Every structure is written in structure tokens, then in C-alpha cells.
Amino acid sequence: MALKKLRFEDILLGLTLSLTFLYPLIITLIILYQDAKRKEKEMKIFQKVENIFLSKRCRERILEIVPYLEFVSDSFIEKLIKVCEFTSGKKPKDKEYKNLEEESLYLIELERGTLKVLGKWISDEEFKLLLITYEPKT
């Protein structure tokens, strides 16, 4: 049995078939890489905002969180809401409370929507966050 000579057309056909299957794989890998990079940037911003909520007084937190929100996605806002649900101010040392039962709602207008911060003042410096929501403009 004699071996058939490899012709140019056979090589071209083999190359075309292999590229047909490799091209979608390469595109998929590129998309996954870009998605991972985007999530990495999102997590860095998320950690910055989380540090703000865990380390500073609420008034400063609210002022510092606003610049970050213009650059983040809806999934980031959902993560931020989860962090804020578990974050609250320290217990005050002195007993000088504002209206403990009264909830305060702050509306912060952004270019893309409105940030709503709901919470209670525990003392003049400590604020317990109950909920933060973000409503995009329509």
C-alpha cells in the first residue's frame, strides 16, 4: 500500500479545519481574560469602599463613596449593599443619642442615578447603616 503524497490543497484544508475550531476557542479565552480583568478592577474598588465603610464616620463615608459609584457596575452596587447591611457604627461610649428610633434617609444624586442611604444615628459621630440602594436613571 503506497502512501499518498500530501498536496497543497490537503494541507490548506487541514489548516482551515483546525482554525475553524481554534478561532472560537481563542475568542472565548480573550473574553474570559477581559472579564477577569474587569472583575479584578471591580474588586479593588469594592475593597476601597469597604475600607471606607469599616474605618470612618458615616458622613465621611458617604462623601467618599460617591466618586467611586460613577465607575462601577450594577453587580458592584449589589455587593456594596451586602457590605452595608453587615456594617454598622461602633457603640457610643457616651449616652448622648440623637433620636434613636428615627431613621434618616440621604439621597445623593449622581450622573447615572440616585444613591439612597438609610440608617439611624446612634451618636453624633456614629451612624448605623440599614440599607444602601442605587437606582439608575431611566
UniProtKB/Swiss-Prot annotation:
The keyword Transmembrane helix applies. Keywords: Membrane, Transmembrane, Transmembrane helix. The chain crosses the membrane at residues 11-33. Its main location: membrane. One of its GO terms (cellular component) is membrane. It is a single-pass membrane protein. It is found in: Membrane. This is Uncharacterized protein aq_850. It comes from Aquifex aeolicus (strain VF5).
